[in-house]
Amino acid sequence: MADDKPKEGVKTENNDHINLKVAGQDGSVVQFKIKRHTPLNKLMKAYCERQGLSMRQIRFRFDGQPINETDTPAQLEMEDEDTIDVFQQQTGGSF
């Protein structure tokens, strides 16, 4: 019997889409399906609209590194089911 599912950990280069999770600080997780060569600003804007947030209020990070709007999943070497973390923008402070 042939197994049609790709093996765990094996990259399928012919698959143009990738499933990404966006995890908020409140524990919420939103899933997106995006093309590997599509700039991540499309995902960022969709997340903000869905959550009722402004792009100015939050920051997106992958593996601890800030994500630029022009970055693509392919450039960041993202794999299927990877998670992007969302953080509230810190403003001000007090002494």
UniProtKB/Swiss-Prot annotation:
Residues 94-95 form a propeptide. Its main location: nucleus. Pfam families: Rad60-SLD. Gene3D superfamilies: Phosphatidylinositol 3-kinase Catalytic Subunit, Chain A, domain 1. There is a cross-link at residue 11 (Glycyl lysine isopeptide (Lys-Gly) (interchain with G-Cter in SUMO)). InterPro entries: Rad60/SUMO-like_dom, Ubiquitin-like_dom, Ubiquitin-like_domsf. Disulfide bonds: none annotated. There is a cross-link at residue 93 (Glycyl lysine isopeptide (Gly-Lys) (interchain with K-? in acceptor proteins)). Interacts with sae2 and ube2i. Covalently attached to a number of proteins, including top2. Belongs to the ubiquitin family. SUMO subfamily. This is Small ubiquitin-related modifier 2.
